Amino acid sequence: DIILWGSQLFCKPAGHGMAVPWHQDGQYWPIDPLATVTVRIAVDDSLPENGCMRYIPGSHKPRSVVAHEFVEASNVAIRQQVAELDESLAKDDALYAGQISIHDVYLIHGSSENRSTKRRSDYAIRYMPATSRYVRDPAFPANAYAAKTSQLMNYTWRPLWLLRGTDRAGNDFDIGHGRRAA
């Protein structure tokens, strides 16, 4: 019972790719109950020198979203970060082109700027169990946050695909796919 609910290309150009503050994806996504996984495929080598993803090992185990705070900076890709964090625990998630990593919605992660001469690009694919509901209500906290902070993110119209099994949560698989031919 698996739903594909999103994919995204992340690209940090050589010499100026933005930093991504420490965060948990669950802070932003309209899924209830919150259960999802991201499969990240390295398009380019994703190494410390070009801003690879970093993570806090075990931070997903409490199964809760920790407090995030607003970031007052213009050189970051997202404007929120985990409020309290021991960065000395961080590990690099270095990948070579073609390798993958998988991370949980509760994992605390981020990345530094790309100050190298090489681009860093990853393709992320997001899955959720068909026992969770993708919430399209604009008042749901993740949707309200996206509407307030980004003209590019409108989670209420995102298409879903039931890849396997049975939808057990009443998800709408018609929204976001455009008109169907008669």
Where are these predicted regions, by residue range?
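Conserved double-stranded beta-helix
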Residues: 1-54
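Double-stranded beta-helix
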Residues: 46-112
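Non-heme Fe(II)/2-oxoglutarate
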Residues: 100, 106-182
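Feature marks short, surface-exposed loop/turn motifs that line or immediately flank catalytic pockets
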Residues: 13, 47, 62, 129-131
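Short, surface-exposed loop/helix-turn segments at secondary-structure junctions
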Residues: 24, 73-89, 119, 137-146
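A short beta-loop-beta micro-motif enriched in histidine and acidic residues
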Residues: 25-36, 88-90, 95, 118-119
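Short aromatic-enriched loop/helix-cap "lid" or pocket-rim segments at secondary-structure transitions
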Residues: 17, 52-53, 65-68, 134-139
